[in-house]
Amino acid sequence: MVADVSAFQWNDGDWMKERHRFDDRKQPVSIYETSLEEWKSAEELVEFLAEEDFTHVELHPVMEYLDDITGGYSTYAYYAPTSRFGSVVDFQKLVDELHQAGIGVILDWTPAQFPRYASGLEKFDGTPLYERQNPAEAIHPFWGTLLYNYGSPMVKDFLISNACFWAEVYHADGLRMDDVDAMLYLDYGRNPGEWTPNIYGTNENLDALEFLKHLNSVIKERNPGLLLVAQENGLWPELTDSVENDHLGFDYKWSGGWTKDLLEYLSKDPIERKNYHDQLTMSMLYAYCEHYILTLGSRDVGTLKDFADKLPGSEEQKNAQIREAYAYMMLHPGCKMMAPDKDMPKELEVFVKDLNNMYLAHPALYQLDDEYDGFEWVQLMKYEENVIAFMRKTEKPEETVLAVCNFAAIPYENYNVGVPFAGKYKEIFNSDDKKYGGNGVVNTRVKAAKKAECDEREYSITLKLPALGVAVFTCTPEEIEKKPAAEHSQIKKSITKTRTVRKAAGKTKAAVKTAVKPVTKKVTKEAPQIVNKTEEKIPVKKDLTEKK
């Protein structure tokens, strides 16, 4: 069957015109990772993403595949969307409606290997045409699939054309390249004697290096703003530096180190965590070595039940730690990716929406992700208390955000934190809010900084810090508080810039096609405020892994 992919009438012109803005890496990027098989309809997916305020969705491979057990990661037909979820037009409609809702689309793409089917690319003309020439080195050491021969001009043209095809014909906004390690290293998964060194006697796949540079250069030239993401665990240096600097030119790479350290730390009993404090703080030693996407995705934690099983404590404590992990990720430098169950409990659904809302409303949480000036430790060595505190910043002091994270199983009633300047500190988010299933240990009143030295700072505030929770504050310097009302109002407007991604797209959520339930709520000028007035303990909440 042949489909006419050019017949579809796209309605995402405004989005496509503005896509180039992602090249500056100063836009908020919050990704929801999912597979199309999880959803009953395109409308259901679009409505969920719009309501939860994600900026992007990352879809598991949509290119046609034969074996369901691979999850799509053994691509059979590179130029065809899988028929499992509908027709070519159905997929185009999905992307179109996502764009009209202001949501970017990132596709998982597999340029490292292909499956061994006689009807596929294996020995396409009876000879090893697409795979490596040496049969022993052509087999993927872990999956048994075939590795591409990147020294072949035909293979390079095939893959580069395919990447451009998905970006230009199906309007994909990004490609997440799977298993990049298998491309870069000749000895990947092999013992000595099972691989042949390159001409310099080392293990780098020189053909793959040149292919990736050429691929990323061509895609960027033809499709400005397209996000190129690498999953690579071999610590290849400067993977996200530019091709002009003789590097590979990816926009981002998954931060596997951050995820591994955090999950190992959270797996410890809170009583023992003081001995593993470096796993919580080490990430800032390498946070600026690459442009990272922090991930708590399906490969990292599985389902919510799987995530809970990795954590110590009661059901209530497990739920609190899941919220804390997501909140800490959103506050840490780097883009974000998560994959909570689509049928997550209502409390967690509200939590994720408010978390995204806070992220989008405060430029300090994304504008300087890749610059040292965007982050400052306040409390780095409070390992006895299992607490860390830090600031996220922009060039404007009034946009500073203060985050305090308590990884201990006990709350702190009068906890002192040093602050950067005299002024007002207002809690804008607390993971222990009762509406999220927490105990309500929140700070309802604005905190005025007092002149009392703490954390080697002249001023400090005293706050309530929930057990296994995160409290986030905006900071308004005293100088701004004293400004005339009209000028102060103008400053407040600059603080609360929200969702530049969707505004730039020229479409609001309510403009999504009528097939999608209109979402009339807009991103608030500030992150949601704490509404609970009581602080008493409440009964244990239901497990976050329960179905609604």
Question: Where are these predicted regions, by residue range?
Answer:
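Active-site proximal loops enriched in glycine and acidic residues that flank catalytic Cys/His/Asp
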Residues: P61, T82, D108-W109, S152, ...
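Active-site/binding-pocket entry motifs
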Residues: E37, Y65, R299-G302, K434
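Alpha-helical packing segments of well-folded alpha/beta enzyme cores
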Residues: L45, D90, L94, V155-W166, ...
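Substrate-binding/active-site clefts of carbohydrate-active enzymes
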Residues: G13-K26, S35-K40, E44-E204, L463
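Conserved alpha/beta catalytic core and glycan-binding cleft of carbohydrate-active enzymes
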Residues: H171-D173, Y188-P340, L360-D432, N439-G440
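Carbohydrate-interacting/catalytic domains
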Residues: M1-V29, E37, E43-D53, N319, ...
